[in-house]
Amino acid sequence: MIIGIGTDIVGIPRFQRHVDDPDSSLLRRIFTDQERSYCNARKSGAAACFAARFAAKESFLKALGTGLSDGISWHDMEVVNDELGKPELRLSRRAEELFRKKKGAGLFLSLSHDGGCAVAMVVLESL
């Protein structure tokens, strides 16, 4: 049974400014070391990569229905890719706890970017 759906769209230029600024703390605050390494390795596509991952985190928070309240940190949600490149959302700490509290059993993530925007959709499922 579906217990939550969230979607978010983000302007890629918003993240390009932070990719271009080595002193920007925003990327460290929102993204894990692994996420930053993955996106920065994309060179010209780094901003789109960061924007899509931010949209994924926002989409999860919308699907969960909490926003960043209730003790969830940006680092409690991490977008990783499987061996075929499929993006997955890895939860930890408070995000995982609240997901389980809602009887969450499955989490589905889709990412895309085009025309200066990145979009993500998250579907939460229970047994």
Curated annotation (Swiss-Prot):
Subcellular location(s) of the protein: Cytoplasm
Superkingdom in the source lineage: Bacteria
Chief site of localization: cytoplasm
Obligatory cofactor(s): Mg(2+)
Gene Ontology BP annotations: fatty acid biosynthetic process
Residues where Mg(2+) binds: D8, E58
Pfam families with a match to the protein in the record: ACPS
One GO cellular component term: cytoplasm
Keywords tagged on the record: Cytoplasm, Fatty acid biosynthesis, Fatty acid metabolism, Lipid biosynthesis, Lipid metabolism, Magnesium, Metal-binding, Transferase
Coiled coil: none
EC number: 2.7.8.7
Catalytic activity: apo-[ACP] + CoA = holo-[ACP] + adenosine 3',5'-bisphosphate + H(+)
Keyword presence, Magnesium: yes
Listed NCBIfam families: acpS (TIGR00516), pantethn_trn (TIGR00556), PRK00070.3-2 (NF000832), PRK14656.1 (NF011250)
Family of this protein: Belongs to the P-Pant transferase superfamily. AcpS family.
Biological role: Transfers the 4'-phosphopantetheine moiety from coenzyme A to a Ser of acyl-carrier-protein.
Protein's UniProt name: Holo-[acyl-carrier-protein] synthase
Native organism: Pelobacter propionicus (strain DSM 2379 / NBRC 103807 / OttBd1)
Upper classification of the organism: Bacteria, Pseudomonadati, Thermodesulfobacteriota, Desulfuromonadia, Desulfuromonadales
